[in-house]
């Protein structure tokens, strides 16, 4: 059952108040935070204020929406007016934005209760949340492992029930990869469906804000609250927003699902491949037609991304110079101040990407690197377009392996390979969702479902059908009973219904 729906029912029947729910989640957050370190800033005072406002509306007989009174965590690269927004960087350690991001403003207007700002890789550059300047977030399933990144704090907070849902950002997999590592659902929407106004930019043509939740329905409800045109974002799409809850039908008979052959081969771990193949077979048992799809340009996705994204980052991060806001190091000249401020303010990974991007954009190498990468990006988009002429959605593993040990991947290339399967979706601007499809040695494995432009409803429908016929999403990390189950007195730790690891029947395409 959707956690949002269950809590909403308790609120409207006055079984519990929004303040009671907020206090329970804040208590659990505080209890687990020394172990997990999911949050950079906890906004207890704001949360209780927002919860009391919802209770006042209920007492006045006002009808509340499904998001009212629901505890929310926000990735700390989304600007929140009057609340510290650091991007997990020394550069913005004390920065308090004078304005609010569109997505957080919309959710506040819907009555959501913000419990805090979550940890991330510095400026959203990383795949493990180890690049934060302040702390390393732990994976709730195994505290010695990473939660993924860059939205690792948001994923860990939802997995550990420190919040019901969370916001993240996804530039090359930063919602889907940590969702897979932490055993929750994460969605990167179509580029332009959700406003980026107030999201601190990493790579502007790739960044997208999206939701985390325990269930597909929770993610659909949060997406409903943030999707839609925003005149403050020049890349925002002017399209009609459907009711995503209407897509949640556990019936996919006749759906054509493409299996991306290129992402199930070399580079994919054996346990991950087995779990995803079992999930594909299960989708076939639900009535879907399975086709194998070739996307040959995907093999160049990683190289393409690591030219385009750092190039955009080198431009976007030029604004952090110590002049208008953020860190400023004293120096004898303006040029020296720039150098000292950026040397102290940025961490190693951010500096690395700025250097790569500056090199790719330099006069002698622009055509050889940046321009060529943009051409390959077009080829990747064309591969997707050809695939969607034959199928409704595509599926693949979300990550090559389950979560790895903290400190295990110090080599940048081995870290970059974590996003091998998610990057093509960002380069094409498509919607992609990760949901749990199995476990290996007690660690979650994610199934990625990819849709065509603005086809979030199809992605959600396939994800919902799979979720409702399995029990993977009901498993909980070994961290004690979460607030909702305490209130209901029903702790659950079921086994999944679908255990088959045999390959599915496929027709070649």
UniProtKB/Swiss-Prot annotation:
SUPFAM superfamilies according to UniProt: Amidase signature (AS) enzymes
EC code(s) of this entry: 6.3.5.7
Domain of life where this protein originates: Bacteria
Basic residues bias locations: 496-509
Keywords tagged on the record: ATP-binding, Ligase, Nucleotide-binding, Protein biosynthesis
Chain segments annotated as transmembrane: none
UniProt GO BP: translation
Cellular component terms (Gene Ontology): glutamyl-tRNA(Gln) amidotransferase complex
Name of the protein: Glutamyl-tRNA(Gln) amidotransferase subunit A
Gene giving rise to this polypeptide: gatA
Reactions mediated catalytically: L-glutamyl-tRNA(Gln) + L-glutamine + ATP + H2O = L-glutaminyl-tRNA(Gln) + L-glutamate + ADP + phosphate + H(+)
Similarity field: Belongs to the amidase family. GatA subfamily.
PROSITE patterns: AMIDASES (PS00571)
Species of provenance: Synechococcus sp. (strain JA-3-3Ab) (Cyanobacteria bacterium Yellowstone A-Prime)
InterPro entries assigned to the protein according to its UniProt record, in alphabetical order: Amidase, Amidase_CS, Amidase_dom, AS_sf, GatA
Residues at the catalytic site: 75, 150, 174
The keyword Thylakoid belongs to this UniProt entry's keyword annotation: no
GO molecular function term, any single one: glutaminyl-tRNA synthase (glutamine-hydrolyzing) activity
Function (record text): Allows the formation of correctly charged Gln-tRNA(Gln) through the transamidation of misacylated Glu-tRNA(Gln) in organisms which lack glutaminyl-tRNA synthetase. The reaction takes place in the presence of glutamine and ATP through an activated gamma-phospho-Glu-tRNA(Gln).
């Amino acid at each position: 059952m959707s956690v949002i729906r269950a809590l909403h029912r308790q609120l409207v029947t006055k079984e519990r108040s929004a303040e009671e729910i907020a206090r329970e989640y804040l208590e659990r957050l505080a209890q687990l935070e020394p172990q997990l370190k999911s949050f950079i800033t906890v906004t207890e005072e704001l949360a209780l204020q927002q919860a009391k406002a919802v209770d006042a509306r209920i007492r006045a007989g006002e009808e509340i929406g499904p998001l009212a009174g629901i505890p929310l965590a926000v990735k700390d690269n989304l600007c929140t007016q009057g609340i510290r927004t650091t991007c997990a960087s020394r550069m913005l350690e004390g920065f308090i934005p004078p304005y609010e991001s569109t997505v957080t403003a919309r959710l506040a207007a819907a009555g959501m209760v913000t419990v805090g700002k979550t940890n991330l890789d510095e400026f959203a550059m990383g795949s493990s949340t180890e690049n934060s300047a302040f702390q390393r977030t732990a994976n709730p399933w195994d505290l010695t492992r990473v939660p993924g990144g860059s939205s690792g704090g948001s994923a860990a907070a939802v997995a550990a029930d420190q919040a019901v849902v969370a916001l993240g950002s996804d530039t090359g997999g930063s919602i889907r990869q940590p969702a897979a590592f932490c055993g929750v659902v994460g969605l990167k929407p179509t580029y332009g469906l959700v406003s980026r106004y107030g999201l601190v930019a990493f790579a502007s043509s790739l960044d997208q804000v999206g939701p985390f939740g325990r269930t597909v329905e929770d993610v659909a409800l949060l997406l409903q609250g943030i999707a839609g045109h925003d005149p403050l974002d020049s890349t925002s799409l002017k399209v009609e927003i459907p009711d995503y809850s209407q897509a949640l039908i556990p019936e996919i008979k006749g759906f054509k699902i493409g299996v991306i052959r290129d992402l199930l081969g070399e580079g994919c771990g054996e346990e991950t491949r087995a779990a995803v193949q079992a999930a594909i077979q299960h989708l076939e048992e639900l009535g879907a037609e399975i086709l194998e799809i070739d996307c040959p340009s995907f093999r160049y996705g990683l190289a393409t991304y690591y030219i385009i994204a750092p190039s955009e980052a080198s431009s976007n991060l030029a604004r952090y110079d110590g002049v208008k806001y953020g860190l400023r190091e004293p120096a004898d000249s303006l040029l020296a101040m720039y150098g000292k401020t950026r040397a102290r303010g940025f961490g190693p990974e951010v500096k690395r990407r700025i250097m790569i991007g500056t090199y790719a954009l330099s006069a002698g190498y622009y055509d050889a690197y940046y321009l060529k990468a943009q051409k390959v990006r077009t080829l990747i988009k064309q591969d997707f377009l050809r695939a969607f002429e034959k199928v409704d959605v595509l599926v693949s593993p979300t990550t090559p392996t389950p979560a790895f040990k903290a400190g295990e991947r110090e080599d940048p290339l081995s870290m970059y390979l974590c996003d091998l399967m998610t990057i093509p979706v960002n380069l094409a601007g498509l919607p992609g969702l990760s949901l749990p499809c199995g476990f290996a040695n007690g660690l979650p494995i994610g199934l990625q479902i990819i849709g065509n432009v603005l086809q979030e409803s199809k992605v959600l429908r396939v994800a919902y059908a799979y979720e409702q016929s399995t029990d993977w999403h009901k498993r909980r990390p070994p961290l004690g009973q979460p607030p909702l189950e305490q209130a209901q007195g029903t702790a659950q730790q079921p086994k999944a219904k679908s255990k088959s690891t045999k390959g599915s029947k496929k027709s070649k395409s």
